[in-house]
Regions:
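Glycine-rich, basic loop-to-helix element that forms the pyrophosphate-binding segment
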Residues: 62-78
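Short, well-formed alpha-helical segments that are part of the catalytic scaffolds
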Residues: 13-27
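Conserved donor NDP-sugar-binding/catalytic core segment of glycosyltransferases
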Residues: 95-125
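A conserved acidic beta->alpha catalytic loop
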Residues: 39-48, 90-91
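Short beta-strand/loop segment that forms part of the nucleotide-sugar
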Residues: 33-42, 62-64
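Acidic donor-binding loop at a coil-to-helix junction in glycosyltransferase catalytic cores
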Residues: 170-177
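Short aromatic/hydrophobic "clamp" motif used to bind/position activated sugar donors
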Residues: 83
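A recurrent flexible, glycine/aromatic-enriched loop bordering the glycosyltransferase active site
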Residues: 117-124, 135-154
Length: 234
């Protein structure tokens, strides 16, 4: 896998989460010495947590920044045909998720793969909200791909062709880039990544639903993306 895949993890002040992600990566089958770039801009103890939890993982910490900048910094270093972006707060429910999605990308000659979301902190409301999002995204993906940036596997050449993540926008970089891909070359397989309820706790369930709907309705409105206040989400 190390000759095919590069993993990029954007990170900022994730001392309570990054250790769990690294544990999940250590348990992934076939990962071997796959290069993992953690693009970090933390001011907390994140780097110490990384050092304590790296194990056998082939990790290199590089300069981070805003989400798009951090992801692009890592992708720029990739020399493999595929690059996988994973958020620092992600967990997995299967030890074969990376191996399986990489196989699907190659076998079906796809350009982009995203995953469904599942809540791991036992919040019933978040579980329902994620479930509704999964259904909606699956339906809309027939016309407009959206690989949630928490797990976004792409061909490196296509990523570069589309210009990478848009640095000029403060958030929703995953949505803006995803919709440039062909729906025929996109897949959401039967795998999940896990996240907790923290963004719902910050924005509220109605607030999050409104945020996603407004972004969708303004998907081609340049001025909308430029004026988004990322602090409301992050």
């Amino acid at each position: 896998m190390e000759n095919k895949l590069t993993i990029v993890v954007p990170c900022k002040d994730e001392e309570n989460y990054i250790g769990h992600l690294l544990a999940a990566l250590r348990s992934q089958e076939g990962l071997g010495s796959t290069k993992i770039y953690i693009a970090d801009a933390s001011t907390d103890s994140t780097r110490q947590v990384i050092a304590l939890n790296s194990g056998h993982l082939n990790i290199e910490i590089i300069e981070g920044g805003l989400v798009s900048v951090a992801k692009n910094n890592g992708a720029r270093l990739a020399t493999t045909p595929y690059v996988l972006f994973i958020d620092a707060d992600v967990r997995f429910f299967s030890s074969t998720v990376i191996k399986d999605t990489l196989h699907l990308l190659e076998e079906r000659n796809l350009d982009l793969i995203g995953l469904k979301i599942k809540c791991y902190d036992n919040s019933i409301r978040s579980t329902i909200a994620f479930g509704l999002f999964n259904i909606t995204n699956k339906v809309l993906s027939r016309w407009m791909p959206f690989a949630v940036g928490a797990y976004m596997l792409t061909r490196t050449d296509k990523f570069n062709e589309y210009g990478g993540f848009p640095n000029k926008y403060p958030t929703s970089e995953d949505f803006i880039l995803s919709k440039m891909y062909s729906p025929k070359k996109f897949l959401i397989p039967d795998h999940y990544f896990g996240q907790d309820s923290r963004r719902f706790n910050k924005m509220g369930y109605f607030g999050m639903a409104k945020y996603l709907l407004v972004n969708f309705l303004n998907r081609n409105n340049e001025s909308h993306w430029k004026k988004i206040d990322a602090k409301k989400y992050w």
